[in-house]
Amino acid sequence: MTKLTRPELKTSLALSGVVGLRMFGLFLILPVFAAYASRLPNATPVLVGLAIGIYGFGQMLLQVPMGWLSDRVGRRPTITLGLLIFAGGSVLAALAHGLVGIIVGRALQGMGAVSGASQALAADHSHDDNRSKVMAIIGISIGLAFVLAMIVSAPLASSHGLAGLFGLTAILAILAIVFLWWLVPAPPQRTQRAEHWSAVLGMIVSPRLLVLNVSVFFMHGLLTACFVAMPMLIVRDAGISLDSQWELYLPVMFASALVMGGLLRHVQSVAASMRLILSCALVLVLSLLAFAGGSREAWLVWLGALLFFSAFNLLEATLPSLVSRLAPDHMRGAALGAYATCQFGGAGLGGVLGGFGLQHFGLSGLFVGAAAIAFLWLVLLTRGQRLVLNQAQ
């Protein structure tokens, strides 16, 4: 078992601050956007949905180019560019007088696609054996940002409106840039220049990375589909109102962080990582079946949430760590950009399928369907793990 070195820990915490600030600003909008945007002039459900979803389309389109750019010009300059674009989109949305202006601002926000470059920067500063731990620390910061946003979003929106939330998001993005250059050291110099696009595409479609990219597609599709129905399930079965659902998320996230910390200490090899990924996929199936139980028991909701977020957070740490280990160092940014593209693609499709499932099959039907999809992923993963292990040797 390898412990994090002092530089690895320092860099992990600093980068967590950068990522956490950006994600907190992003999460602030989500709990209240639909309710407030529907009151704007000429608002329709289609336009409200477009305003929410167009961010993900921008992310999908630009993750690979931004990751490739980080391989060529450096991680910190690329992340800075992405954060400036994100801040610009936030300002545009804050100044907008109608939903169309907000849609344009959200589209510009999505073009600041820095997830792949940020994960590549974390990988640059960590040893292979410790990379999952570094990703876990960053994942915890995202989880905390999510819970904090759930707590403060409604009060802030009530006092300052959507314009105030978008303005705060822009300020947080600029603060993240300050953190990036003040606290995060420059990554080690690479001796090999980034490859041409043809080589990058060949690397992205290699079987070992396809298995992992398909996995994150399934994982985030399941997450988004579940969040279409999760708030209603928590109200119905656990008796927790929409404004108070952080009371469930906070202890569940804390407990899942403890589970993650305990397990990741023992995951160092590629083979161990794949065993953990398979186990987490199985746990996701079980958690979705707990949600689908239909018994309207609060303890099943709590158990399902603990299983779901423990497995999800472990996967969030392990999958990108494995991508960074299997990709060539000089194409790491592009590889993690492709990974992030699949992540956002899965989230987009999951939202659509989740809404369809809820409308036509109800809460229990949606979660039964999600469990079936998770089981399909588990089967594919069981067959595909050999591709990862064979090419990792």
What annotation goes with each model-predicted range?
Residues 2-8, 184-215:
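Juxtamembrane intracellular "pre-TM" segments in multi-pass secondary transporters
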Residues 31-45, 228-244:
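Short amphipathic helix-loop junctions that connect adjacent transmembrane helices
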Residues 61-97:
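Conserved MFS/SLC helix-loop-helix module at the cytosolic interface between two early adjacent transmembrane helices
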Residues 62-74, 259-272, 358:
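Helix-to-loop junctions at the C-terminal end of transmembrane segments
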Residues 72-82, 269-281:
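Cytoplasmic membrane-interface "Motif A"-like loop-to-helix N-cap segments
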Residues 105-142:
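Cytoplasmic helix-loop-helix junction between adjacent transmembrane helices
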Residues 171-189, 380-384:
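C-terminal membrane-cytosol helix-exit motif in multi-pass small-molecule transporters
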Residues 274-319:
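C-terminal transmembrane helical hairpin of 12-TM major facilitator-type secondary transporters
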